C-alpha cells in the first residue's frame, strides 16, 4: 500500500448508534463493512492489501466475543510492523437508562435478552464489553446526542479538508403526466406559468432552446416567482447541511416536462452552482407522447 491505511474498528453497546456511525464513515469516504463474520477477517484483509487503492476502512462489529476483538487487533498489530497503518477503536456508549429507552421505543429485543428484560441484556453486555471499552482510543457517549450530533462528533475525529463531503444538489425537471420523481426532496410545480406549448413556433422545442428559455424567463410572473423561490432555497440550504444532509434533489415540474420546468431548472442550476456542487437533468424533456389536454 502506497499511502497510510486508516483502519477504524467501531463497536460499543447495542443501541448506542453503530448504524449512524457506519453511515458517517461512509460519508467520509471509508470502505465500510458491518458485522463481518470472524472467519472472513483474514481473507478480507488480504483483499484490502491486494486492492492497493483503499486507504480508509471502517469495520463495524459486535465485539461481545472477546476472541473476535483479539483476532482483529492481533492481525492489525502484526501488519503494522510491515505496512503503514493507523488503527483506532471507537467505542459507542450510552447510559443504561437511555439504552433501555431506545429499545422500548423500537420494540426490539436486546440480543442478550431475547426472552427477558431489556435491562438485563444491557447489564450483561456492559460487563462483557467493559475490557474493550477501557482499551478504545475514542469513547463517544451518545446518551444526549441526536444522530446529527453523533455524525458531527465522528466528523470531528476523522474528517480532513479532503474528506469533508460536499453538499451536492441535483436539479431535475419533469412532467407531471409521467409522475413526480420518487427521490425528490423538494418539488416545485410551475404549471402556473404561461405555457410555450401553445406558441406554434415553440411547441416542438424544449426549455433549453434559447427561444423557449427566453419566453419562460421573461414573463412577469416568472420574474417575481423566481426571485422569491431562489431566495427561499438559499435561505434553507444551510439548514439541510446542519442536519447532516449531503445530497438534495430539487424537482421542477410542469405538465409535460418539456418547456417551463426545463427552463426554470436550467436557470436554477446555474444560480445554485455559484455556491454549491450542482448537477442538472431533464427527465422527460424528449418524450413526445401526444396528449389531448395540456393545462
Curated annotation (Swiss-Prot):
Binding site for ATP: 12-19
Molecular function as annotated in GO: ATP binding; GTP binding
Keyword GTP-binding: yes
Binding residues annotated for GTP, in chain numbering: 62-65
Superkingdom classification of source: Bacteria
Keywords noted in UniProt: ATP-binding, GTP-binding, Nucleotide-binding
Keyword Transmembrane helix part of the UniProt annotation: no
Listed InterPro entries: P-loop_NTPase, RapZ-like, RapZ-like_N, RapZ_C
SUPFAM superfamilies noted in UniProt: P-loop containing nucleoside triphosphate hydrolases
Role summary: Displays ATPase and GTPase activities.
Family: Belongs to the RapZ-like family.
Name this polypeptide is given: Nucleotide-binding protein PEPE_0450
Source organism per UniProt: Pediococcus pentosaceus (strain ATCC 25745 / CCUG 21536 / LMG 10740 / 183-1w)
